[in-house]
């Protein structure tokens, strides 16, 4: 065995119990294990950074979903970027930067027959930085791209509203809608986030939901109604937009972060009859359904980053896997500003 590899220790975070409400320290178990030499056809990767996403809260729950729950005792699922440190696969060389699903751990190995299924793929740092590969060029960007373009189907001149506008998915959706010739209205929490999406990202307007004036803001900024609503939050904000739909509107259901830590029943829409009155459509989307088209979206979005039509903002937390529990909860308390990333190592 490689003597350098044999000296490495893999620090991990495992799911110890299923949260009720906001995850606590009791829901996590810190563990470590030696790093093993990769087998025939396998690739060993050092994790450099992890993508922290609202969807992770749903993965901790039991029950039917679009992806199996994380098992108790299993390393917590997470996307990330890393660098290959050992390879017995001709498709990957030592030093290659890759994206994939490492989980919350410092090293991960992918068997040769699992590489495609795992999503392990080389990334080109000429197209974007490591953190941009977790943001606009990663799962959030793919979610925003296919959710808006395939489900929302925006047309030039239409009004697009996106909640969670300063977050990872929201910033991609809003900028892409602007590039496609739409009027863009964001909904975000706090004056600083609203100012940023208007001043830096080019949104036409942004409504601060913390001001309690979402309905009034929609009336002011969407006088002809909402043609496309990209929903990342659910709850009262979804209901407010439902009451302001234009005829033939499309609602993209991407997430409901306002509801993820409820200890009771999830709040459903009250104004759903607006769908009937306005001949509107509300459709859920899961980004993994579009995996075979990721290269198309990455090429387009990378072009926008290069020519300056699109910007990205990442909120990078340091501290390695030990910082994971606290960092994850930043998503659910509104403390992150931009795409939340947990840095594990330089590289």
Model-derived regions: residue spans:
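Short amphipathic alpha-helix with an adjacent loop that forms part of the alpha/beta core around
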Residues: 213-223
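NAD(P)H dinucleotide-binding glycine-rich loop of Rossmann-like/cofactor-binding domains
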Residues: 76-83, 93-164, 310
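Glycine-rich beta-strand-centered segment in the early N-terminal region that forms part
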Residues: 34-52, 60-104
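C-terminal hydrophobic helical "lid"/dimerization subdomain
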Residues: 2-8, 288-347
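Mid-domain Rossmann-like dinucleotide-binding core that forms the NAD(H)/NADP(H) cofactor-binding site
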Residues: 134-212
């Amino acid at each position: 065995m490689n003597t350098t590899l044999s000296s490495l220790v893999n620090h991990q975070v495992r799911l110890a119990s299923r949260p009720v409400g906001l995850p606590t320290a009791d829901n996590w178990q810190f563990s470590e294990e030696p790093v093993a030499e990769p087998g025939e056809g396998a690739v060993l990767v050092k994790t450099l950074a992890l993508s922290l996403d609202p969807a992770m809260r749903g993965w901790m729950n039991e029950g039917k979903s679009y992806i199996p729950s994380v098992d108790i005792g299993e390393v917590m699922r997470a996307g990330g970027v890393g660098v290959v440190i050992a390879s017995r696969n001709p498709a990957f060389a030592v030093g290659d930067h890759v994206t994939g699903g490492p989980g919350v751990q410092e090293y991960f190995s992918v068997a040769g027959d699992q590489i495609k299924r795992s999503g392990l793929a080389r990334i080109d740092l000429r197209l974007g930085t490591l953190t941009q590969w977790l943001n606009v060029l990663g799962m959030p960007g793919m979610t925003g791209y296919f959710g808006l373009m395939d489900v929302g189907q925006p047309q030039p001149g239409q009004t697009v509203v996106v909640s969670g506008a300063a977050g990872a998915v929201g910033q991609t959706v809003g900028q892409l809608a602007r590039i496609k010739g739409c009027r863009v209205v964001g909904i975000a929490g706090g004056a600083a986030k609203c100012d940023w999406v208007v001043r830096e990202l080019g949104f036409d307007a942004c409504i601060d939901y913390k001001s309690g004036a979402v309905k009034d803001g929609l009336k002011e900024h969407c006088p002809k109604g909402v043609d496309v609503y990209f929903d990342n939050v659910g709850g009262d904000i979804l209901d407010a937009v439902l009451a302001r739909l234009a005829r033939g509107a499309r609602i993209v259901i991407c997430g409901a972060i306002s509801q993820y830590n409820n200890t009771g029943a999830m709040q459903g829409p009250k104004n759903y009859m607006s769908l009937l009155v306005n001949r509107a459509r509300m459709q859920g989307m899961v980004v993994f359904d579009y995996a075979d088209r990721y290269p198309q979206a990455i090429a387009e979005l990378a072009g926008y980053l290069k020519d300056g039509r699109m910007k990205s903002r990442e909120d990078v937390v340091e501290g390695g896997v030990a910082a994971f529990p606290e960092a994850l909860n930043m998503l659910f308390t509104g403390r992150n500003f931009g795409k939340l990333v947990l840095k594990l190592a330089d590289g």
